């Protein structure tokens, strides 16, 4: 997210890491013979007087004497880095045959851990330093005294690392028991590929303010219109918090999967929350559920607009009862994200939804509200202004003219046609199945690999990919995960299947609207379920894209979209559909009727109060349109 107002938000650089560490001394056979557990420790990368790359381990308190380990032949195990765990195996005194020391890192903020490991790998790749000196040289030479923290990664080091990548085969064949040479290997780590992300993630001033409040332990609700970077910021927040005690949830399974969490209902363990409070408390006292409540220190809730007020109040009361604390929400820090002007809570029958901000406990649980105002998804100011008006239920003659004009847009090319957003999921399934059958040729089926096949239905509900993906030549598809942001291969990127590999699994080759043709390989999704258990699914990051539902599109950015709003049934639904498009040129609206643009008057009042508290008003967004706009309030209210 480039911007002139970007600021870095990390409190310390990528050469330091604070986490839990277990130090294990291993026998020559690899068996642990001594273990020391440190609940809070600091790891630092640096060099000694001989310019050797070192790792310093510092524990607080009386046992805080620092220990330094040479990194000449370090091995990294990073399979669980995404959940804040990793292992570093260091040969004792840098000699592989002398037994090893193993550092088991846990409860690391995942983003901090990723960048720490990246820095370690890169420094070893570009500046391995001299090999281990002989015993005579060590006795006669100066004693390595000082530990100097290494400098942050420089652009020149990135270029040098990219120019010195070793072939993967050489890494795999390197014998572990060979005699160490006097010249340290250029890359001693058993990794498949050196990935060089661009600069450190940056946040805007608004986003950085939210992160600072979160890291101070403040309960907060941050909001903003579609495309203001709420999901981006939420992922950055989760990467900055220790996994232990942090529970990531969302109101829907798909939204929960995007942040690697679980649904709010699954975490709470009280079903729909319709039962009396005493019964809900009893349900929450079941062993697995109760422990989850007790362990929770920070509760993240995404897509809050779809959470009903009564359910929020019930959760707040259950939290206090189970945790036996009188503080709001049982003392849990709340990190809440969403836009109440988007999709409302789902209710049965003619019952009107009550939004979370109407909950009795809302104000005491969420004392701070911050609004993101800078739009990142769309760059066209005309389109941004149009979406702002639609978000507030305003549909002037000019807005109507612009949206009706999109009916003539040709939003696809090179065999890629627009995705139709539907108000009902049944229409999506029927459309995709019908269009796939109409294509000639053989069906290519790709089955997912689930970590627990017995819980596949849970993964179906929370993953954006299904157990089975069926494709044909010419199938319209959409990426459902970021693969290479700099190349345009992002979540929501549209493409068409142009072939299949002749070997192996016959992986699909997809031509994307951005002009890139890519063979799509299996990726992994991880979700958290009740009791803290993690489930994973491996599948191609694709879904059929002739049609998709408005609900499942929430939070996505789409290249080319076709919308029919004739069956819109909820406030905010038209706005969510329209705001999925990255540009006005990539949007086609069929049979537009300005009466479908409406929003809930209670939500308007909530945001008006919020802005007035900051010395702003909703009218100040666009005074020219405000004078002629029609206020389309939901007629059911």
Curated annotation (Swiss-Prot):
The keyword Lyase does not apply. Residues 1-180 are annotated as: PINT. Its EC number is 5.6.2.3. It comes from the Eukaryota. InterPro entries: DNA_helicase_pif1-like_DEAD (IPR010285), P-loop_NTPase (IPR027417), Pif1-like_2B_dom (IPR049163), PIF1_helicase (IPR051055), PIF1_RRM3_pfh1 (IPR048293). Belongs to the helicase family. PIF1 subfamily. The PIF1 N-terminal (PINT) domain enhances the interaction with ssDNA through intrinsic binding activity, it also harbors DNA strand-annealing activity. Monomer. Interacts with telomerase. This is ATP-dependent DNA helicase PIF1. It comes from Rattus norvegicus (Rat). The lineage of its organism: Eukaryota, Metazoa, Chordata, Craniata, Vertebrata.
